[in-house]
From Swiss-Prot:
<dbReference type="GO" id="GO:0003700">
    <property type="term" value="F:DNA-binding transcription factor activity"/>
</dbReference>
<protein>
    <recommendedName>
        <fullName>Redox-sensing transcriptional repressor Rex</fullName>
    </recommendedName>
</protein>
<keyword id="KW-0238">DNA-binding</keyword>
<dbReference type="GO" id="GO:0005737">
    <property type="term" value="C:cytoplasm"/>
</dbReference>
<dbReference type="InterPro" id="IPR036291">
    <property type="entry name" value="NAD(P)-bd_dom_sf"/>
</dbReference>
<dbReference type="InterPro" id="IPR022876">
    <property type="entry name" value="Tscrpt_rep_Rex"/>
</dbReference>
<dbReference type="Pfam" id="PF02629">
    <property type="entry name" value="CoA_binding"/>
</dbReference>
<keyword id="KW-0804">Transcription</keyword>
<dbReference type="GO" id="GO:0051775">
    <property type="term" value="P:response to redox state"/>
</dbReference>
<dbReference type="InterPro" id="IPR003781">
    <property type="entry name" value="CoA-bd"/>
</dbReference>
<keyword id="KW-0678">Repressor</keyword>
<keyword id="KW-0520">NAD</keyword>
<dbReference type="InterPro" id="IPR009718">
    <property type="entry name" value="Rex_DNA-bd_C_dom"/>
</dbReference>
<keyword id="KW-0805">Transcription regulation</keyword>
<feature type="binding site">
    <location>
        <begin position="90"/>
        <end position="95"/>
    </location>
    <ligand>
        <name>NAD(+)</name>
    </ligand>
</feature>
<dbReference type="GO" id="GO:0045892">
    <property type="term" value="P:negative regulation of DNA-templated transcription"/>
</dbReference>
<comment type="function">
    <text>Modulates transcription in response to changes in cellular NADH/NAD(+) redox state.</text>
</comment>
Length: 210
């Protein structure tokens, strides 16, 4: 499914809508109005209708959205109607915690490779059954296990080198937790995660917000 360029804020909200709808499914909710969905997602109903309108017509006027149907439609829009294989590079405290987090599998993301340079970690088996490979093996393992997305949790000094290796291995999507901006070709999409930036926003609102 191909669409024109969509604002990133819309894509992020679609993820929020989908997770909220999945929670509603667990509560046996079959149909929901845009007003109720908006309230639970922290947006206004017009925003939901606008976001969905980028991709077609959804729901029934005066009735609302069929929850299961809308979940499946959003999954298709986001490309989540298929599994995605992940590789973790850097098994320090953060990387180890993330790779153990069950929420990834719940949403269709599966770790199929893990890498580190520490000889005390390389060769060890993780709770999910993965054996930690040395970073020197990255390209071969990435291709063998058909990894789609690389996650970097290395120190900043190593992040660019790891990004280069991931790109050479054919990876076009990187989630970067290292506290540094990495440079990649245009064909590779990078999402940077820096918790301190979120804290800066909170600090601002606590200091000057109403």
């Amino acid at each position: 499914m191909k669409f024109a360029k969509i604002p990133m804020a819309t894509i992020i909200r679609l993820s929020i809508y989908m997770r909220t709808l999945q929670e509603l499914l667990e509560d046996d909710v079959d149909v929901i109005s845009s007003e109720r969905l908006a309230k639970q997602c922290g947006v206004n109903p017009a925003q939901i209708r606008k976001d969905l309108a980028y991709f077609g017509e959804f729901g029934v006027r005066g009735v609302g959205y069929r929850v299961n149907e809308l979940v499946n439609q959003i999954k298709e829009i986001l490309g989540l109607n298929r599994p995605w294989n992940l590789a973790m590079v850097g098994l320090g405290n953060l990387g180890s915690a993330l790779i153990r987090h069950g929420n990834f599998i719940k949403h269709g993301y599966m770790f199929t490779a893990a890498f580190d340079v520490d000889p005390q970690k390389v060769g060890k088996r993780l709770p999910n059954g993965l054996v930690i490979n040395h970073v020197d093996e990255l390209e071969d393992v990435i291709k063998e296990r058909e990894v789609h997305v690389g996650i970097i949790t290395t120190p900043a000094s190593e992040a660019q080198s790891v990004a280069n290796q991931l790109v050479l291995a054919g990876i076009n999507g990187i989630l970067n937790f290292a506290p540094v901006q990495i440079q990649v070709p245009d064909c590779c999409h990078v999402e940077n995660v820096d918790f301190t930036i979120k804290l800066d926003s909170i600090a601002y609102h606590l200091s000057f917000g109403s």
